[in-house]
Amino acid sequence: MNITIKSSRTVDGNIAAPPSKSMAHRAVLCAALAKGTSHLHHLAFSKDISATLGAAARLCARVTTGENDAVVEGLGRFLPVDAPVDCCESGSTLRFLIPLASLTGQEVTFTGRGRLMERPQSVYKTLYQQQGLRFEQGADRLTVEGALTPGEYELAGNVSSQFISGLLFALPLLGGTSTLHLIPPVESRSYIDMTRAVQHAFGVESRWLDENTLEIPGGQHYLPGDYTVEGDYSQAAFPAVLGAVTGGVAITGLSEETLQGDAAILEILRRCGARFTRTGQGVVFEKAPLHGTDIDLADCPDLGPVLMVLGLLCEGTTVIRNAERLRIKESDRIEAMETELRACGGQLESEGGTITIHGCAGALHAPEQPLSGHNDHRVVMSLAVLALATGLALPISGAEAIAKSWPDFLEAIKPLGAEVEHVG
């Protein structure tokens, strides 16, 4: 899908944060592992969440979806897996399910699309080899076989928290107690605690013995229940950056009491000089002069692309550190954003996981050729923010990538003054 996006008027208006994708993944799996019927409220059926729902239905549950909810009937047993489980492009789906597949007593093969099977799984590969289990990763599929055992596990704490969460889902169902030793530094701790909080809502417990060690009692059972998903700070970051630059934007549906690591967007914007007010379940932005700052992305890597846009629109220099994981997402997000922002006159450079961005709002211009979305939802949405914040008409190819996380994004931003033209 090729589009041209621009602002049709002064940017202002209200936008609702979509349901949290991170929390929805976790709630779907907990509900599927619980014997009985659970009702999940406030869902958005992005491609990633649809992948997790589909995988749950293949492995251990019956799933019925409504307009924005789902009924998940956990069967209390694993079904025969006679064909590959399709994870589409969802890294969360794949990494959460690999340890659970090892509880089925079967050979389980996962497939995916885009760059999914290129993304590193060495944490699991090493763990499986240590336990004498089968772990084979090819160009388009990944196969596991053999049963995990309770005991001591050691993982690097600076890898994706998805690996740690995947083990947290499976280990409580084993017969004995397990301990996860995380080698510091532990990054994305908020996502680990989000997993634990959703598990708690479904009757499964774990505890921190110290800041680097988790104890997971075995012999537990997930319990069915009703669960309502919070609004998503990861997605709200896009209108939040826009609101910080232009003012006049109100975002609804954001809980102040949240475990979402990407809620850090508000503190980052505050450090840049943004002016906003919390209003219960919302945030209202006023226009204010913005300046560059130093940003540590270790605990909130998904904010990276839109913060690169923010840096261009601030006075002075913005430095983003610990952004290495952006290179192994749906695209190499550092390279993708550098390429597209430079095409618009952006001044930025990177070395490893450090990105330096020079404020240059007055020098930005429309590109000579359409910008590429790089098959990456966060790249597309970040470029849309750039268009609306600057008033430039930006042509973007591959805009369909937004379906991965926020299918209604283009419609959602129209009340803010966005004009979206579909080309070809």
Regions found by a protein language model. Give the residues of each.
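Short, structured segments at the rim of ligand-binding sites
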Residues: 1-424
